[in-house]
């Protein structure tokens, strides 16, 4: 975000917690303001302190990034009330799409395919069991206000469903302050495909192609993303893209967002959810489209029109992103904290690294374990894979446990190279757990 602003000649203010005092973003910005102690609830989730920092520095807009308050409708609404531009969709859109059950209803009305599921929130265990008997096991329990894999349970029978409802509700309440859940048919061995959307405030909506995000841990955490999806033929790709645009128009979407789908074995696809923010994996779409999504977010928020239509979007080559995290794959991806004693980023043509770490940086225990995103672009998938393999062997991160070796193993896996990638790939092909 800071780099995009610098290229647009916009002054920046970084907010940081006491635990992030030495973080790179606070050094790169024109100004930096401490907004509280290290725990996120006292700093990055502290709306009053963030708004105060904006007032003190005279900031006219806030970019929420892709975590913490990025999909919090209350925060967006407060920004609107105090005349600070929230760089993202309106608070009403965030609230509407943030409730997964309500989003399902809206998609049904807009003729966007959805996975067969309950109409609204499950209120009783009996209702859930009746639905499961009608549709057939397995089913998946989902948090209505959820995301990031929390509040989700795949169940195979009545006993697991009863237990899963209680667990999912508890997780959802703890994570989102909302224990509501709903139930869907579980699509076995699907691909997770998402479409990058960009919409201005004048009614124009385009998509920048799809990303295959199927490589996930058992906790539904994405590890690798690529674009385009190897499983989509031109006809299916057009249908998925058109469905994503219908979804965005149905809710009156503005700014950058992502429409997520499950792709079944018979080329059927179903709406899952819409992420009302920029995604961690957005560089994949930037690499194949040549469009700087963060710059576009800022321009759209300033009221500018998109300078192109769908017919003008040209996607070229293949891009892959690996999320390198401070986790131990041998211990079910347990977080690792400590000091980065040595860091070397890969380089070369078609290689991009987005990272906040450096030699001597101390990983705080309070936040996400992401260390770096390595993104490689090639003329085709084979070249992108080779370039990523070379880059990950060149990359050095010492001092904490990382997923570097695990990512290297994924890239050398024969099934991955053939494009046979589904959401259970890591468990089935890599032996997770």
Which residue ranges define each predicted feature?
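ATP-binding N-terminal substructure of ATP-dependent carboxylate-amine bond-forming enzymes
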Residues: 1-109, 122-130
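ATP-dependent carboxylate activation and anion-phosphoryl transfer catalytic cores
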Residues: 1-7, 32-33, 55-57, 73, ...
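Structural detector of well-ordered beta-strand residues that form the stable sheet scaffold
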Residues: 13, 63, 85-87, 115, ...
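A cross-family glycoside hydrolase active-site/sugar-binding cleft signature
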Residues: 15, 65, 117, 184, ...
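A structural signal for short, well-ordered beta-strand elements
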Residues: 43, 96, 121, 154, ...
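Diglycine-centered glycine-rich loop/turn motifs
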Residues: 91, 116-117
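A polyampholytic, Gly/Pro-enriched intrinsically disordered region
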Residues: 104-115, 136-138
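Acidic/histidine-enriched active-site and ligand-binding environments that engage anionic O-linkages
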Residues: 130-140
């Amino acid at each position: 975000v800071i780099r995009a602003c610098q290229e647009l000649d916009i002054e920046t203010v970084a907010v940081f917690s006491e635990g992030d005092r030495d973080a790179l973003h606070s050094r790169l910005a024109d100004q930096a303001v401490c907004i509280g102690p290290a725990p996120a609830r006292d700093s990055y989730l502290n709306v009053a302190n963030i708004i105060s920092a904006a007032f003190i520095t005279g900031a006219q807009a806030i970019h929420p990034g892709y975590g913490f308050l990025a999909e919090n409708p209350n925060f967006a609404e407060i920004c609107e009330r105090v005349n600070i531009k929230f760089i993202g969709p309106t608070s009403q859109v965030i609230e509407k799409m943030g409730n997964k059950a309500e989003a399902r209803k809206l998609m049904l009305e807009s003729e966007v395919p959805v996975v067969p599921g309950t109409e609204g929130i499950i209120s009783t265990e009996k209702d859930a069991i009746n639905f499961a008997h009608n549709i057939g096991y397995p089913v998946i329990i989902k948090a209505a206000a959820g995301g990031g894999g929390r509040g989700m349970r795949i169940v195979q029978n009545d006993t697991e469903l009863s237990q899963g409802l209680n667990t999912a509700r508890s997780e959802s309440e703890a994570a989102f302050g909302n224990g509501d859940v709903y139930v869907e048919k579980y699509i076995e061995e699907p691909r997770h495909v998402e479409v990058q959307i960009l919409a201005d405030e004048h009614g124009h909506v385009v998509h920048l192609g799809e990303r295959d995000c199927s490589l996930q841990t058992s906790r539904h955490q994405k590890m690798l993303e690529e674009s385009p999806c190897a499983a989509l033929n031109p006809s299916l790709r057009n249908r998925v893209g058109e469905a994503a645009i219908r979804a965005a128009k149905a809710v009156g979407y503005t700014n950058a967002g992502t429409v997520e789908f499950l792709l079944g074995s018979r080329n059927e696809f179903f709406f899952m959810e819409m992420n009302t923010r920029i995604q961690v994996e957005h560089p994949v779409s930037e690499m194949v489209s040549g469009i700087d999504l963060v710059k576009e977010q800022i321009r759209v928020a300033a009221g500018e029109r998109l300078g192109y239509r769908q017919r003008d979007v040209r996607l070229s080559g293949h891009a892959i992103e690996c999320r390198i995290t401070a986790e131990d794959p041998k211990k079910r991806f347990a977080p690792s904290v400590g000091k980065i004693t040595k860091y070397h980023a890969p380089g070369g043509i078609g290689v991009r690294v987005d990272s906040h770490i450096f030699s001597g940086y101390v990983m705080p225990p309070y936040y996400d374990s992401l260390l770096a995103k390595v993104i490689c672009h090639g003329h085709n998938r084979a070249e992108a894979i080779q370039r990523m393999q070379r880059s990950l062997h060149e990359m050095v991160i010492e001092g904490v446990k990382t997923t570097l070796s695990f990512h290297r193993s994924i890239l050398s896996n024969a099934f991955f190279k053939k494009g046979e990638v589904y959401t259970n790939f890591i468990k089935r092909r890599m032996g997770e757990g």
